[in-house]
Structure formats: C-alpha cells, structure tokens
Amino acid sequence: MRMSLQAPRRLLELAGQSLLGDQALAISILDELPRELFPPLFVEAFTSRRCEVLKVMVQAWPFPCLPLGSLMKTPDLEILHYVVDGIDCLLAQKVRPRRWKLQVLELRDVDENFWTIWSGARPLSCSPEAMSKRQTVEDCPRTGEKQPLKVFMDVCLKEKFMDEDLSFFSGWVQHRRGSVHLCCTKVVNYSMSILNFRNILETVYPDSIQVLEIWNMCWPCMIVEFSRYLSQMRNLRKLFISDGCRYLLSSDSQEQLVAEFSSVLLRLEYLQMLYVRRVCFFRGHLDQLIRCLRSPLETLALTYGFLEKVDLKCLPRYPSLSQLKQLNLSHGALRFIRLEPLRALLEKVAATLQTLFLVDCGIRDSKLRVILPALSCCSNLTTFCFHGNDTSMDGLKDLLRHTGRLSNLSLETYPAPRESLDDRGRVISELLTPLQAELMRILREVREPKRIFFGPVSCPCCGTSPTEQLEFNFCLWGRPA
C-alpha cells in the first residue's frame, strides 16, 4: 500500500528533475503544467539554483501564497532578485495572466507544511485533493480593481543601518508603491537611529504591524516623531518601549510628551500588551495613559523604577485593567509605596491572572502581608516570581501558606530568607539548606510544587545565572537572546 501511495510522488519528482534538465522546455510549458507539479518542481529549481526557471515559475504560480521563507532558512539575495524580477514582469502587465493567483509572498519561516504536503511527505492526511478543497475560496479570482501583492517579513533591527535584504525590499516596495505592500507583523528596533527607523516605518504597510518593540526610546523627540507612525498601526496588539530615561525633561515638556502619547493610545483599539521598561517620561502620569486605552489589556509590564505612588494608585480604577492575564511590576521600587492599590488590582483580576512578576521590588514582610489575601484568590495563577525581595523566614512561611491553594502554579521563585544572608546580602548555603527544607515541608502539607526555586538560582527558562543578572523577565518578558 505504501508503495502505491508513494510511487506517483516519486514519478512526479523524476518528471520534475527531467524537465529541469531542459531549462528552455521547462519555461515554455509552465502555462500548461499541472499545479500539482509546481511545488516539487519549484523546490528542485530552488535547490539546484535554476534562477531563470524560478523567475518564470513565480509568474505562473497557481497558488495564492508562495511561502519562500520556509525554503530559504537564511536570506539569499540572488534568488530574491530573480523572484522579484518575476513579480515585476507580472505587475507590468495591464492584463493579468489567466493563471494569476499569487497574492502573498511569504518570507517568514511559517509554512513549511506547504512543501511537505505537496512533496508527498504526508499523502494520507494532507493530500493535494484535500489541500485543493481548503484553497477553493482563496483561489477564487478577485473582481474589481487589482489588489496589491503582499510581501510578509519580520523586521529585527540590531544595527544602525539596514541590512542588504531589508534595504533591497524597502527600495522595491517604494518603487512599486501602491501595487506592493510590505507587511511586517513584527518590527523590533534595538539600535537603529531615528532617521533610518523612520524610513522603515514609512515603507511598511502600517495596518500589518501587530508587534512593535523599541529598545532605544532615549530621545524625547523620538516619542513625538514615533507617535505619528504609531497612530497609523490600527491592528497593533503588542507595544514595547524601553530606555527612555537618558534625559531629564521640564514639567512642560513631559506633559507635552504624555499628551502626545496618550492621543496615540486612543487610536489603538486592539492593543492587548503594553510593556514600559526603564522609561521616565511617563512617571507620575500613568493615570493619563491608562485612561486612554480603548480595550482591556491582557498584559501590563511596568518595570525598572517606573512607578510612583500616584501611578500605583490608579491601577485598580480602570476597566481596561480588569482582565489582565500577565502583570509585571519588577524592579519597581515598591518599598516606599503603600501596596493597598496593588491588593485592589489583584482582587480585580483574580479570575484571569496567570502570570505575576514582582521581582526585586524591595517588598518586606509588612508590605507582603498587605497583598497576601488577594494573592491567594488568584486561582488561575501559573507563574509567580517573587525573588530578589527582602523577606524573612516568617514572611516566606506566610506567603507559602497563602499560595498553597493555588494548584495551577507550575513555576514559582522566592528569595532566600533574610536569615540565610550575610552582612553583604550574600547567601550562606549552610544556612539556606535547612531553611529551604523547612519551607518545602510547609508547602507540601497543602500541595506538591512543580517547579520552585529559593534564593539565587539559574533562570528556569534559559539557564542564565542570576548572579550576573537577576532578571527573570529576560526570557518571558524581555529581550530575546
């Protein structure tokens, strides 16, 4: 049975190899080639770098999407040039060919199944016939005016200037403005200058951006410049801004920046995740920002000294924070702030909260006791990170008794008890070991923990040692490795 299923596939493969042996013939008969032959023939031409064949195949591609990114694990500028040349030939025609189907050039590595399906790797569950049925609606010819071709790629800017691939596509899209849209669901800028970043934002189709991360929001003027583009990103789901504390501003300038940014948030009706990391522009004005959120957030991260008393006080007030699934207030210097507002917020989101980060917040026993009743009601909590705080053995015992009922917890981190530290705050392992055993005994009286860490430990997500960087947010909440 297996031979009978695989044999036709093998014959198609051999036919494709034979056809590519005569490049002129292959090009001449593409219009009559069965669509089942296109994917294996394209893979063969791609592997053997028959660039002229690829160029012509793009023009006759019989599917709505060409998932080139899953074939090209690393960008190949030569092949990209030939593919774009083929598309240009199509776009230059006033009357589109009969077999015109291509609507999307996918440069992300997201659709490897397409090639395995058509190469026969899964002939039973995903046959060409089944694939054809799924694409019936997509393959229907469009009527009316020509739709722009969409080119999908993610943008990660780690240098001050664009790399060759991005520069090439940026120039091509600008040349073909109106007929080609550069769509980037994710745009990340680590270090590119504001001028070059502006050029990128002017090229990318703004409605396509769903995730935007800016790690160098250091210039006040960048907020104003950036806001103009941000307001056009109507489908933005995640916004991350970092490092905006390099310059001190006058109160008038700060109020102007807050007003500018608040007006932008009013336009982002689909925003679900907001991360503000080491940004001082908004300190003391969080109320104004939260008030402008159009829809409930799933994730709120305000980290590295962002919060003041007035900021924390406003958090429980607004409906936009009533359905939080993730909350991160790490490195927030909460030692001198009353935590009753945090308790009120935890009570409000007790039914939805899944992840809570209160890392290195300066929370001592008296502050901890304020939030414990609310914390014990967060029945869906799966991750709780509390390490880096100044907590005694009695405080940790009380904390574990309150979290003992949280049966969904799969990851929890706690500081070493104060009694196990020396005068410099370093852990004395001989003291920590028996205290840790006692804490585990107390917890096991109510539930069996899954992953639990006390004191300085390696990150359970990536293994990085916190002796160098005590941040658990670099895996789940911060900059990727």
Curated annotation (Swiss-Prot):
The keyword Repeat applies. GO terms for cellular component: Cul2-RING ubiquitin ligase complex; cytoplasm. GO terms for biological process: negative regulation of apoptotic process; negative regulation of cell differentiation; negative regulation of DNA-templated transcription; positive regulation of cell population proliferation; proteasome-mediated ubiquitin-dependent protein catabolic process. LRR repeats lie at residues 99-126, 181-205, 206-232, 233-267, 268-293, 294-325, 326-344, 350-377, 378-402. Keywords: Leucine-rich repeat, Repeat. SUPFAM superfamilies: RNI-like. GO terms for molecular function: ubiquitin-like ligase-substrate adaptor activity. Gene3D superfamilies: Ribonuclease Inhibitor. It comes from the Eukaryota. Belongs to the PRAME family. This is PRAME family member 22.
